[in-house]
Amino acid sequence: MTVYYKGFPQSDRNEAIKMVNVDELEDRVRKVMPEAAYYYIASGSENEWTWRNNTAAFNHFQIVPRSLTNMDNPSTETQFMGMDLKTPIMICPIACHGIAHKDAEVATAQGAKAAGALFSSSTYANRSVEDIATATGDSPKFFQLYLSKDWDFNKMVFDAVKSAGYKGIMLTVDALVSGYREANLRTNFTFPVPLDFFTRYVGAEGEGMSVAQMYANSAQKIGPADVAKIKEMSGLPVFVKGVMNAEDAYMAIGAGADGIVVSNHGGREIDTAPATIDMLPEIAAAVNGRVPIILDSGVRRGSHVFKALALGADLVGIGRPFLYGLALGGAKGVESVINQINNEFKILMQLTGCKTVEDVKHADIRQINYTADNLPSNTDPSVRRAYPVTKENQMEGTQDAATGASKH
């Protein structure tokens, strides 16, 4: 069930996961994942207010039930940018899936394919875009770009992504430098597994680098001209990822963006930034249907997916939960996570008389002044729990927190 890369424990599971909801996976994954690796995934920046509020803010919106709709068997299938999907839930790009599973992004993409969901791969992925494409065929795939200062590197990435059959690029614009992530500092987190594009271009594997060091390789300034240049060089649709206000949405569309991703990087960059769901109505009104909108950050329930679609999103991304599924069950675990949230979403479609995803976009949502900010912060010493020590979450041979193991 566990293999080791230079002493770093990696799951090799491939099994469906039984769960009541995806939240319960966060405790379960601590038993199979090293402490630093877990906190790299789970934590946010500074006091983690935004990380917590991203989920809590969905309680600002109420779903108004509908009855006497004479409808059954709703369909969660949808189309997006010419791609046929079984669900409006997508896999968000996250770096280094190898901290969760030995097959890394290949297993994640296989799980997304099985669930009929759009998969997106990170510039800082462990596995190559070619390996992922070979394992998943023509299943829908996007690529997330951390723009490099080196345009030769960028061109190499664009050519590889297009040749591998990816359907679009998500340009990340909200992470020009790393947010101040205290949990990563406390555990001395560094990437324990090589990152493909670093290996093939600069000969530096990325292994052993901190998050801040990794971001230092990326462009520290991005403007509208970069969006146009990426479109021209790549020949692919470009979504601007990290839009949190109407003005930036206008600028992105004006620069030629083919889509908008409403995201605050999962609460990992600016702490006390607004929750994405709170900003979505304003941004959707500004976009006014001119380009598709994706929302991510804080999504944990089918009701969150429903609310995001009703408030203006076309797809809804999940991040941390699928990595927990990857660690606990490999490709089948990722599929289980997507199916769990999608099944919750389908129940709400039935209870609101929504036969299709398009119907959900016209559902009745009411905003209220309410919050339920009851999630503990990973950085608050008063609520930090002792990290469990198990055979599966320890380094092989040595105990070195810098590469992800606990010291107790």
From Swiss-Prot:
Domain of life: Bacteria
Enzyme nomenclature, EC number: 1.1.3.-, 1.1.3.15
Keyword Flavoprotein: yes
A Pfam family matched in the record: FMN_dh
Residues reported in the UniProt entry to bind FMN: P93, I94, A95, S122, Q144, T172, K241, S263, D296, S297, G298, V299, R300, R320
CDD domains recorded: LOX_like_FMN
Enzyme class: oxidoreductase
FMN hydroxy acid dehydrogenase domain location: 14-370
UniProtKB keywords: Flavoprotein, FMN, Oxidoreductase
Matching Gene3D superfamilies: Aldolase class I
Signal peptide extent: none
Intrachain S-S bonds: none
UniProt binding sites for pyruvate: Y40, Y146, R181, H265, R268
Cofactor: FMN
Reactions mediated catalytically: a (2S)-2-hydroxycarboxylate + O2 = a 2-oxocarboxylate + H2O2; (S)-lactate + O2 = pyruvate + H2O2; 2-hydroxyoctanoate + O2 = 2-oxooctanoate + H2O2; glycolate + O2 = glyoxylate + H2O2
Active site (record annotation): H265 (proton acceptor)
MF terms in GO: FMN binding; oxidoreductase activity
Cofactor note: Binds 1 FMN per subunit.
Complex and partners: Homotetramer.
Protein family per UniProt: Belongs to the FMN-dependent alpha-hydroxy acid dehydrogenase family.
Function: Oxidase that catalyzes the oxidation of a broad range of 2-hydroxyacids in vitro, such as (S)-lactate, 2-hydroxyoctanoate, and to a lesser extent glycolate, mandelate and 2-hydroxyoctadecanoate, to the corresponding 2-oxoacids, with a reduction of O2 to H2O2. May be involved in the utilization of L-lactate as an energy source for growth.
Protein's recorded name: L-lactate oxidase
Protein source organism: Lactobacillus jensenii
Upper classification of the organism: Bacteria, Bacillati, Bacillota, Bacilli, Lactobacillales
